[in-house]
């Protein structure tokens, strides 16, 4: 018998996370590793599991995440976005609280490109008057 799965895709910075929710005990697996082994900072892990707290579904689903691109912060944000979208497929009534908390909004902030004539995106070489 096929197991019930709920899917969602999340994005943040240059990261894309494909999230699957499976009814279970609340175990989170990112790229085949436990989330505590994969992400180095505790605040990223708590940030990542916020949608479950908002919808009061903590410990109801196992999370399987396939994420690539970006760094740890972007990957955690993409996973959070994906979990929120997947929870919408579980129950459409979650839309109100998730939207109010800003979980469904794709964060548009991206790395600004480097401009020629400058050292970085906005950093210029020191100005000399004489």
Swiss-Prot record:
For this chain, the family text in UniProt reads:
Belongs to the universal ribosomal protein uS9 family.
For this entry, the protein name equals Small ribosomal subunit protein uS9
Q: Where is the composition biased (Basic residues)?
A: 111-130
Give each disulfide bond as a residue pair: none
HAMAP family, A to Z:
Ribosomal_uS9_B (MF_00532_B)
* SUPFAM superfamilies (alphabetical): Ribosomal protein S5 domain 2-like (SSF54211)
Coiled coil (UniProt feature) = none
Key word Calcium present in the record? no
- Annotated region (Disordered), positions in chain: 98-130
Query: Which Gene Ontology cellular component terms are annotated?
Result: cytosolic small ribosomal subunit
One GO MF annotation is:
RNA binding
Can you supply a Gene Ontology BP term from the record?
A: translation
Keyword annotations of the record:
Ribonucleoprotein, Ribosomal protein
Q: Name one Pfam family in it.
A: Ribosomal_S9
- The domain of life for this entry's organism is Bacteria
Q: Does the keyword Ribosomal protein apply?
A: yes
Known PROSITE patterns for this protein? RIBOSOMAL_S9
